[in-house]
UniProtKB/Swiss-Prot annotation:
This is Vascular endothelial growth factor receptor 2. The lineage of its organism: Eukaryota, Metazoa, Chordata, Craniata, Vertebrata. Pfam families: I-set, Ig_3, Ig_VEGFR-1-like_5th, PK_Tyr_Ser-Thr, VEGFR-1-like_Ig-like, VEGFR-2_TMD, VEGFR1-3_N_Ig-like. It comes from Mus musculus (Mouse). Present in an inactive conformation in the absence of bound ligand. Binding of VEGFA, VEGFC or VEGFD leads to dimerization and activation by autophosphorylation on tyrosine residues. May be regulated by hydrogen sulfide (H(2)S) levels via a sensitive intracellular disulfide bond. InterPro entries: Ig-like_dom (IPR007110), Ig-like_dom_sf (IPR036179), Ig-like_fold (IPR013783), Ig_I-set (IPR013098), Ig_sub (IPR003599), Ig_sub2 (IPR003598), Kinase-like_dom_sf (IPR011009), Prot_kinase_dom (IPR000719).
Amino acid sequence: MESKALLAVALWFCVETRAASVGLPGDFLHPPKLSTQKDILTILANTTLQITCRGQRDLDWLWPNAQRDSEERVLVTECGGGDSIFCKTLTIPRVVGNDTGAYKCSYRDVDIASTVYVYVRDYRSPFIASVSDQHGIVYITENKNKTVVIPCRGSISNLNVSLCARYPEKRFVPDGNRISWDSEIGFTLPSYMISYAGMVFCEAKINDETYQSIMYIVVVVGYRIYDVILSPPHEIELSAGEKLVLNCTARTELNVGLDFTWHSPPSKSHHKKIVNRDVKPFPGTVAKMFLSTLTIESVTKSDQGEYTCVASSGRMIKRNRTFVRVHTKPFIAFGSGMKSLVEATVGSQVRIPVKYLSYPAPDIKWYRNGRPIESNYTMIVGDELTIMEVTERDAGNYTVILTNPISMEKQSHMVSLVVNVPPQIGEKALISPMDSYQYGTMQTLTCTVYANPPLHHIQWYWQLEEACSYRPGQTSPYACKEWRHVEDFQGGNKIEVTKNQYALIEGKNKTVSTLVIQAANVSALYKCEAINKAGRGERVISFHVIRGPEITVQPAAQPTEQESVSLLCTADRNTFENLTWYKLGSQATSVHMGESLTPVCKNLDALWKLNGTMFSNSTNDILIVAFQNASLQDQGDYVCSAQDKKTKKRHCLVKQLIILERMAPMITGNLENQTTTIGETIEVTCPASGNPTPHITWFKDNETLVEDSGIVLRDGNRNLTIRRVRKEDGGLYTCQACNVLGCARAETLFIIEGAQEKTNLEVIILVGTAVIAMFFWLLLVIVLRTVKRANEGELKTGYLSIVMDPDELPLDERCERLPYDASKWEFPRDRLKLGKPLGRGAFGQVIEADAFGIDKTATCKTVAVKMLKEGATHSEHRALMSELKILIHIGHHLNVVNLLGACTKPGGPLMVIVEFCKFGNLSTYLRGKRNEFVPYKSKGARFRQGKDYVGELSVDLKRRLDSITSSQSSASSGFVEEKSLSDVEEEEASEELYKDFLTLEHLICYSFQVAKGMEFLASRKCIHRDLAARNILLSEKNVVKICDFGLARDIYKDPDYVRKGDARLPLKWMAPETIFDRVYTIQSDVWSFGVLLWEIFSLGASPYPGVKIDEEFCRRLKEGTRMRAPDYTTPEMYQTMLDCWHEDPNQRPSFSELVEHLGNLLQANAQQDGKDYIVLPMSETLSMEEDSGLSLPTSPVSCMEEEEVCDPKFHYDNTAGISHYLQNSKRKSRPVSVKTFEDIPLEEPEVKVIPDDSQTDSGMVLASEELKTLEDRNKLSPSFGGMMPSKSRESVASEGSNQTSGYQSGYHSDDTDTTVYSSDEAGLLKMVDAAVHADSGTTLRSPPV
C-alpha cells in the first residue's frame, strides 16, 4: 500500500508539471491560492503586508494605485517550496492608508484570479486618495433616476461618513435607502441632489477628530444638441475619381458627450474613412462643437446617393443629410431657354440669366462687343448679367463664355441687347412753355424727336387757348380736356403744311416734324405727340398771338423798396379801349369754373381793380399805375385788361412785379494783397452787393483813382485792371461801395518788384525788335519744315503701333478713331513726381517718375513717363497720342511693358505712363554677368565645377566677346540714354539682382518669357519688327518684358509705307524676306527671335561676330549660311535657333510652338539641376510633357569632355526627338547639317568708327562699290515675297525703331536730328533699295530723317 501511495503522488506530480509546462485549458484550471483564506484582510498602518500566491501557471499580481510591477515599494518575488512550482509573494513594507484596496493574483494569459480586499487601518488618514479618482472631478446628470458615486473610499470599514456640498453648504447623511456610504465604493446618492453644488467632499469623525477626503469638483454633463450642419450644405457634384469630403459639425451645450453615425449608399469598395474630433469653439460662444469627417479618396458611380450624419448624445438625436451626385466625367452645356435677343427700356433694370448644365461649376466671363466686362456700380457680373439702369450706351452684343475648369471645354452664347428709348423731344428743354407770336405772321412750329426704335407715328393737335384751363406757376400752365387734329383747323389758325423728316445720327433715330401756320390769328395751344413701342412723348406749345396791350416797368425791371415805380400798359388806341389795371390777389385763386381754374380774363370781377392815370399819343393809349415809395407789399402779379373795340372781347396780360428789399452795401470776402513785377498785369474785383446797387469808387493811397492809360475800370467799377504796371503803381488800394444806406470799404496792397520800367520809347524799340525777330523766326521755321516735312498724307508711323490698310481709312484718321477712356486711364499730373531722365530722342524723352496712387497695391510706384520735348509739332503730339491709344488696344500682359495711365487733359504736357524696369535691357545685363555665369547651381560639387569652368575661360575668348560687343547699340526706341544702364542701375537697388550667379536655367527662362510675350502680341495681331535683346527689359524677380512693341504693326493691315531719306535698320536681326522684299510678318519676328536666342546664349554678344556685312554676307545668308552656335548654348537650343532661321517662313515654328518647346526644355533643365519643378515668373501655368525629347549636358565638365558636342562649329543632325514642337509642325524636311559663316574663311573687315550717339548694332556695313553687283544678282535670284500673303513697299532704309517708346537710344543723333552713317552702311541701304526696285518695278521715295 505504501508503494502504491508513493506511485500515486509521483503520478500526480508529473501530471501537474506537464499541465503547467504545456498549459491547460481555462476550464481545467483552479484559481490561484492565496496565503490568506479571508476575503477581507485588515492590518495596521506601518506594518508589512505579505501575501503569497500559488497556481498552476505563470502568475501576476495587481494592487491598488499601481500597474503590475511599476511601484518600487512593492516587492514581488518568486517563492519556492510548497506543492506548486508557480509561486509569487507580494510584499509591501510599512503600509499606509492609501494601500487599502483589492489585491489580485491572476494567471498571466488566462482571466482566472483570486482577490483579497485589504484594509490598512490608518486613523490619521481614514480616506483613500487613489489615482482612480479622475483628478477630483465628478460628472453628473440632472436626471432624477440617476445616481452618482463620490469615490471617497475608506481605509477603515466601519466609519461614520457624511457628504458635505458647497456652495451653499449642505450635508448629506446615509439613510440606508438612496443615500449610502461603502468603504470599498464611496458615497452614493441621487445626482440631482448635488447638481447645484460646485464641489463636494466626505467627512468622518474618529475620537472627536474630524477628517475630510479630497475635494471633488461637480461637473454637470448636458445632453442638448443645438444643430447638426453638413458642409458643403448643398447637393454635391463630383466626377469619378475625385475626392469626397463631408464635414458634419454638431453644436451642443457644454459637457456633452457625442457619438456620430454615418449612413451612406452601399459601396463595393471599402474606401470610406471617418474621423471624429472635438473642435475648439469660437471665443465668447457658450457651446461645444464636435466634428466628424467622412472621406472617400476616389469616388465611383456606386458612391452616388444620400449621405446622412447622425449625432447622438444618449438622450437626444439629430441628423442632417445631403445628396452626392457622381458624374462619369466633367461636362458643360447651355440649358434650354437661353435667349438670343433681350429688349429693355432705358432706365429699367435688365437681367440676362445664364442657364447651364455643368460639372464642375464653370468659370463665367462676360464680354460686350468683344471686350471683357467687370462688375461695377452699374453692372453686376455673375451667373446672370445685371444692368442696374440701362442706358443707350449699354446696347450691343453680350457674349457669355463658360469654361470647364477641369476639361477646359468652352461654350459660348451671344445675346443681343436692344435698348428702347421712349420719344424725347429736344425743344422741351430749350424753349419756354409760353411763346408769343405777332398777329398775322406766318409761323413754323417744330418738334425734334429722338427715339429707338423708330416712331410709330407723330401727330399734331390743337385747341383754343380759352378752352383750356390755366394753372399759374406750373411748368405747363394750360391743360386741355379735348384736343383737335390739326387737319380740323376750323375756328383756329389755318395750317399750310405738315411734314416729317427722318435721319439716323450717331445711332439715334431722329425725326423732325414741322407744322407751318399760314397766319397767326388765334391764340391756341398746339401739341405734338410721338409714340413708339417704348412709350410716348409730347410737347405743348403755347401759341399766344400778340396784338393787344404791352406792359413795361419804369424805371427798372427789378426796383428796390422806397423807390418810385410805375407800371405802363400800352395798347393800340385804334383797336382797344377801356384799359384797366387789376392786381391778382389770393382771392383769385379760389375762384373755380367746374373743376378747373378759369383764365384771368374770365374772372376779372374777382380781381382787385386799381386806379391809374391815362396818357395818349397819336397811336397808343397808356395807362400808368404809380407806386410812390414802393414797399414789399406792393409786389405781386398785375393784370392789364384791354377791350377790343369791334368784338368787345377782352385781352389780358399778366406782369409780375418784384420789389427788392433795401440792403446796405456789403463786401463779401477780403481783398488779397498782390505782388507782381514791372510790366505785368494786375486784376482785382470788388465783390460788393446791396440794394439799391451800390456805387463803387476806387482810391489809391486815399486819393480817388480815375481811368487813365493802363488803368481800366469795368462792370460798374467792380473790376480794376492795371496793365503794364510801373513802380509807382504800387501802394494801398481801397474799394468803396456806397448807396443810400451807407458805405463799405475793403483794402488791398499792391507790391511792385523789379527794376524801374523803361521809357515808352525803349518799350517801343524792344517791342518792334521782338516783332521783327519773331517774323524772321517763323519764316525760318516754315522754310525748314517745308524742306524736311513729308507730304500731307504721311504720318511718322515709325513710332506708331499700327499701320492701317490704305484701302480703308487714312492712318491718322484710323488712329484718332481708336477709343481713349479717360475715366479708366487718365491720371492727375499733380500726383506724378518727375525724376531723372532715362533717355531722350529727336523729339521725345523718357523720364523716371514716382506715381502716387496709380497702383492699388502700393501708395507710391516708380514708373517711366514718355513725353515730348519742348517745341514738338502737332503731328508729333498726334503720334504720341496714337501710340497711347494703340497701347490700350493691345492690352496687358506680364511679359510686355504695360501701359499704366496717361495725362492728356489740357493744362500740361501729354504724358504716357508705362511700367518701369529697374534692371535695364537684357543685352547689357547679360554682358555684365559673363564672369558670374555657371551652367548649374543646385549641387555643391557642380557649383564648384561651374566656378572653375568660368574661371578657365580663355583670355582670348573673353577678349573676343568684349571686342564683339564694344560697338553694341542701345536700342531703336528713338531715345538715347543719358548714361549706360549699368551705371544707372548701380545707383539704384540693383545689387541684389547682380550679386546672384547666372545659370543656364536663367537663360532658358528668359527665352521662354520672351516667347510668351511674343505669343501674346501675335494673338493681338501685332508684328514687332525689331525683336532684339536691347528691346527686352529686365524687371524684378527675373521677369523680362518686351518693349518697343510700339513699333509693331497690325497684321490685318498692310504694313507697306514709303519713307524718304536714309535710315538705319537692324539687318542682323532681319529675316531674308524682310531685307530683300520688305515683308514683315509674325514669321519674320520668329527669325528675329532666333537671333535673340543667339544673343542670350552668347551672353550679350553681337550676332554674326567677325562677319563683314556686305554683298557676300547677303548672298550667303540667302543661300542658307547661318551663324555658328553661341558659346554657352546646348544642342537643343541651337537646333531651335536653326528652326527659327529656316529660309521658308512657313516652315518656321510659331510662337505658341516655341512656348511649348522652351517650357519643356526649361522643365528638363530644372529636373536635371535637382528640382522637381521650377517656379516661373509668369501669370499662366505651364504644363510640361514628360518626354520632351531633350538631352542636356550633365555638367560643364562633361561638356568640355565631349568636345564634338560643345564645339560651336558642330553641325546638328535632324533627329526626331530634338524638338517636341515639330511633331505637329508644318515642317516636312529639315537640312541634315548647316553651313555656318565660319566654314569659309572671311577676311577681317576694315573697322570704321562711328560716333557713339549714332552707333547701332544693325550691322549695316556695305561698300558703295558693291551696290551694282548685289543689284544684278538680286535680279536673278527668286523673291522672298512670293512666299508671303502680303508684301511691303517699305524701304529697307526706313526707320526701324519706335521713337517714342522704350528707354533705349535709337538711330538718330539728338544733336543734329539727322542720321549718321558710315559709307558702307549707306551703300548697303542704297544697294538693297535698288535691288528691290529692280525686282518690283516700284519707284521708292527716300524716307524722312
